[in-house]
């Protein structure tokens, strides 16, 4: 196990990484600082299909240590620049806080005498389409140290692995030779989460300070805008599409839509109204299938009750953030009673 091997010789491993990152070759003579000996290793790839098909990538343990070091130093600096209502992968924020915040806005819009509308923005294959050149330009505006930029570029543009997809192509259907080297971020990297927020902060700032949108909220690439005039909202959409195309080199997909604010708003796995936050049907379906699978393993004697209980408790913890009285009763009737009887 590479993790245990690294930890067993932690001091030596850290010194080795330090030397590679600080440009000293083995003979102790300083080398060219722009040609350090640190290179990102090869990625391990894994296909996952829930909640949707994706390629998850993982680096070796030493490379993850380097990522963590840069993340700890850089993320707090960039986080200060983010807007209040950006909720993805930030300390003290998350899906629950994002849903709760949006729900406080919905009554203000749906109760007004003037009809409000909701713009739901969905960026096509966001993590697979981030442009490396654009990302480096954004980073270079805030980071002046060329040595740090050089190492970040190695994380962003890996010479051994392509992260990008051609427009309109699904990851599970893309041939290896068709993957793109100058686009995309590896799903699974800690730094990818940071870069994803930094990249779309350009859109956040544009919407808040140029378009003066008050009710704007984002969780990664899931974005909601509330606005009191439908025609003006179409104009806002056109301005956003222009920025995405000309400056960020991104596109919106067909899920992008404008709907009346009195209809349930779909956001981060939920249907949100002024009175309820309901778990999306697809999420409920996956949850029931998983519980049914776990229940079958338990009844066949293939897993212990502790494993079943842990799964059930995790789902109960998830459900408590939704308006889900009937759903909770159904789970208890369908699964918990039978499982506890069998235990």
Where are these regions (language model features)?
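Conserved two-metal-ion catalytic palm core of "right-hand" nucleic acid polymerases
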Residues: 1-138, 143-144, 160-163
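Conserved polymerase palm-domain catalytic core
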Residues: 13-16, 20, 42, 105, ...
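Surface-exposed helix-capping loop/turn segments at secondary-structure junctions
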Residues: 27-32, 80, 209-215, 248-252
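Right-hand nucleic-acid polymerase module
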Residues: 59, 68, 172-182, 205, ...
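A generic structural signal for residues located within well-ordered alpha-helices
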Residues: 61-65, 191, 195, 263
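PAPS/PAP-binding and catalytic site of the sulfotransferase fold
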Residues: 70-73, 237-240, 244
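Beta-rich nucleic-acid/ligand-interaction surfaces
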Residues: 89-98, 224-227, 258-262
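A common structural junction motif
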Residues: 143, 241-249
């Amino acid at each position: 196990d590479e993790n245990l091997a690294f930890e067993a010789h932690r001091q030596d491993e850290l010194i080795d990484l330090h030397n590679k990152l600080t440009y000293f070759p083995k003979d102790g003579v300083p080398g060219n600082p722009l040609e350090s000996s640190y290179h990102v290793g090869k990625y391990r790839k894994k296909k996952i299909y829930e909640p949707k098909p994706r390629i998850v990538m993982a680096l070796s343990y030493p490379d993850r240590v380097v990522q963590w070091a840069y993340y700890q130093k850089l993320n707090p600096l960039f986080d200060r620049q983010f807007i209040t209502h950006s909720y993805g992968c930030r300390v003290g924020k998350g899906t629950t806080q994002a849903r709760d915040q949006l729900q406080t806005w919905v009554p203000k819009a749906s109760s007004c005498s003037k009809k409000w509308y909701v713009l739901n923005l969905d960026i096509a294959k966001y993590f697979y389409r981030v442009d490396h050149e654009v990302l480096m330009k954004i980073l270079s505006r805030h980071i002046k140290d060329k040595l740090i930029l050089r190492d970040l570029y190695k994380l962003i543009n890996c010479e051994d692995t392509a992260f990008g997809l051609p427009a309109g192509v699904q990851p599970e259907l893309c041939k290896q030779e068709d993957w793109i080297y100058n686009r995309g971020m590896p799903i699974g990297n800690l730094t990818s989460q940071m870069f994803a927020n930094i990249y779309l902060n350009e859109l956040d700032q544009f919407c808040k300070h140029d378009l003066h949108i008050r009710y704007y909220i984002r969780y990664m690439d899931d974005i909601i805008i509330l606005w009191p005039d439908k025609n003006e909202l179409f104009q806002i959409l056109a301005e956003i599409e222009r920025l995405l195309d000309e400056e960020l080199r991104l596109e919106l997909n067909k899920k992008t839509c404008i709907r009346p604010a009195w209809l349930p708003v779909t956001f981060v796995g939920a249907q949100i109204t002024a009175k309820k936050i309901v778990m999306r049907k697809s999420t409920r379906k996956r949850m029931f299938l998983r519980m049914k699978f776990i229940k079958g393993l338990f009844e066949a004697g293939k897993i212990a009750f502790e494993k079943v209980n842990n799964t059930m408790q995790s789902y109960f913890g998830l459900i408590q953030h939704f308006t889900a009285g009937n759903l909770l009763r159904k789970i208890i009737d369908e699964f918990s009673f039978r499982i506890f009887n069998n235990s």
